[in-house]
């Protein structure tokens, strides 16, 4: 599951369309300013729209101080140490002996190179820390130009990711308060052990100095010195044990931090998958409500049309029977009667065809009911998947509560949860394929129904034309009959 976004040219007019969709919302400058001011960061809307390198550097250093525990000035100290710049060099410049102009020129060039190296190192170190922090926030395309030549849109996107991270941390922080308290207590214990170590070392040094002074003045203190040396060895042994304990506590604290980050990331992924499943359930419900009602209405309309056609056919058949009695007694109009019989046979075939089409419509309705039943079963399976996701969330909460237990038990529980999650994903893919197949069948039935409707309308018009011709023939025949009578 990738969360990367592609970096676009800041000067391009269509740079916003070159980013792939991020998992966090893009906020406007007003909301960004309000949120950062609420978090006690010194920002303005003008600086966010048109950021400067100094503003971005200071703001990002405050982010590192607040969220990663890197104090302000640490990056400058590391850059100064790496470039071997003496921070007091400018203050001591007046105390140097006077040099020749050529030596002064060479020194100035060397100082300029050193300062350039210091600026570049400071920028690289800041970028390294920020890349780690922004990757956690969902920004994986952070580059050096975002610090040296910041762009308004990219800074707005980065600040939106940071605010989304702050909101997520505020929502999830109550769940980890007890773990944070335990970490603070462990850190306090480590500090106490370190203070005890320092005090013990000071005592040892003081005793050594005192013993050295006493040994110079009086040789009778040798026995005491031996005793103190043995005591010192015991203290050194205890000091080594305390150092081992300190290293172990530090390692446990680092392991806890890594475990905490993994658990938080897994919780974010599960919430994201849960939201996607909710959207798919809503779409399935919408399809079920809309398509079924339309097909039922179409079927009812076709049934009503079929009933009206059958009624017309019965009336025509009755009229034909009444006219047949008169036609049998009249030999003169035999040819016209044959034409009428042929036309009546055509009408009968058309009516039988309508009945067949009605049967087909009924079969389609049965298929539609079957598809509806399968769709309802699929919705029930989706609800089961949703319940399984809820159970997974509950298990995940239990894992967070038991995070301070043995590492082996935590890993075993995480593997079980991961297996269940993979099963749910595979089951979800199967359900998606089944849903796609059902939707294809529904579309096919709709197309067949539309074709039948069109054919029915066309044949109805043809029958109406034939009925009109039949009525004209009957009227002409009746008028001829009256004239003959």
UniProtKB/Swiss-Prot annotation:
Report the locations given in the UniProt record: Nucleus; Chromosome, Centromere, Kinetochore
Disordered: region residues: 87-112
Q: Name one GO cellular component term.
A: Ndc80 complex
Entry annotated with the keyword Phosphoprotein: no
Bias class Polar residues marks the residues at: 89-100
Q: What is its main location?
A: nucleus
Q: Which GO terms describe its biological process?
A: attachment of mitotic spindle microtubules to kinetochore; cell division; kinetochore organization; meiotic chromosome segregation; mitotic spindle organization; vesicle-mediated transport
Q: Which GO terms describe its molecular function?
A: microtubule binding; protein-containing complex binding
Q: Name one Pfam family in it.
A: Nuf2
InterPro entries documented for this protein: Kinetochore_Nuf2_N, Nuf2_DHR10-like, Nuf2_N_sf, SNARE
List the residue ranges forming a coiled coil, or say none.
177-449
Which UniProt keywords are given for this protein, alphabetically ordered? Cell cycle, Cell division, Centromere, Chromosome, Coiled coil, Kinetochore, Mitosis, Nucleus
Query: What is known about its subunit structure?
Result: Component of the NDC80 complex, which consists of NDC80, NUF2, SPC24 and SPC25.
Protein's job: Acts as a component of the essential kinetochore-associated NDC80 complex, which is required for chromosome segregation and spindle checkpoint activity.
PANTHER family in alphabetical order: KINETOCHORE PROTEIN NUF2 (PTHR21650:SF2), MEMBRALIN/KINETOCHORE PROTEIN NUF2 (PTHR21650)
The entry's family comment says: Belongs to the NUF2 family.
Q: List the protein's name.
A: Probable kinetochore protein NUF2
Q: Which organism is it from?
A: Candida albicans (strain SC5314 / ATCC MYA-2876) (Yeast)
């Amino acid at each position: 599951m990738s969360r990367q976004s592609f970096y676009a040219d800041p000067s391009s007019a269509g740079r916003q369309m070159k980013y792939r969709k991020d998992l966090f919302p893009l906020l406007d400058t007003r909301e960004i300013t309000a949120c950062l001011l609420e978090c006690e960061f010194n920002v303005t809307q003008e600086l966010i729209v048109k950021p400067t390198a100094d503003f971005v550097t200071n703001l990002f250093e405050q982010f590192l101080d607040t969220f990663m525990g890197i104090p302000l000035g640490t990056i400058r100290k590391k850059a100064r140490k790496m470039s071997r710049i003496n921070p007091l060099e400018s203050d001591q410049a007046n105390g140097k002996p006077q040099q020749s102009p050529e030596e002064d020129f060479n020194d100035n060039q060397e100082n300029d190179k050193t300062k350039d190296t210091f600026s570049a190192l400071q920028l690289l170190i800041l970028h390294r820390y920020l890349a780690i922090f922004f990757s956690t926030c969902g920004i994986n395309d952070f580059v050096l130009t975002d610090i040296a030549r910041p762009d308004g849109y990219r800074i707005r996107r980065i600040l939106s990711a940071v605010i989304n991270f702050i909101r997520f941390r505020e929502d999830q922080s109550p769940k980890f308060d007890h773990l944070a308290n335990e970490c603070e207590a462990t850190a306090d214990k480590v500090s106490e052990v370190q203070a005890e170590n320092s005090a013990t070392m000071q005592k040892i040094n003081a005793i050594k100095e005192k013993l050295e002074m006493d040994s110079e003045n009086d040789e009778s203190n040798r026995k005491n010195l031996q005793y103190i040396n043995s005591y010192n060895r015991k203290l050194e042994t205890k000091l080594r044990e305390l150092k081992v304990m300190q290293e172990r506590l530090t390692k446990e604290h680092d392991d806890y931090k890594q475990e905490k980050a993994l658990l938080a990331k897994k919780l974010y992924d599960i919430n994201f998958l849960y939201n996607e499943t909710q959207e798919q359930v809503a779409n399935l419900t919408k399809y079920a409500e809309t398509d079924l009602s339309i097909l039922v209405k179409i079927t009812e309309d076709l049934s009503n049309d079929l009933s009206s056609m059958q009624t017309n056919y019965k009336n025509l058949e009755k009229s034909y029977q009444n006219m047949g009695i008169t036609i049998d007694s009249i030999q003169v109009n035999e040819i016209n009667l044959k034409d009428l019989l042929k036309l009546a046979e055509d009408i009968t075939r058309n009516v039988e065809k309508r009945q067949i089409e009605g049967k087909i419509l009924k079969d389609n309705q049965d298929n539609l009911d079957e598809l509806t039943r399968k769709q309802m079963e699929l919705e029930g399976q989706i609800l089961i998947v949703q319940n399984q996701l809820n159970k997974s969330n509950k298990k995940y909460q239990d894992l967070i509560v038991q995070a301070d237990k043995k590492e082996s038990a935590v890993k075993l529980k995480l593997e079980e949860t991961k297996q269940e999650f993979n099963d749910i994903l595979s089951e979800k893919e199967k359900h998606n394929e089944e849903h796609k197949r059902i939707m294809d069948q529904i579309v096919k039935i709709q197309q067949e129904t539309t074709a039948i409707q069109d054919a029915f309308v066309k044949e109805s018009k043809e029958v109406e034309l034939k009925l009109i011709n039949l009525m004209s023939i009957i009227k002409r025949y009746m008028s001829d009959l009256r004239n003959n009578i």
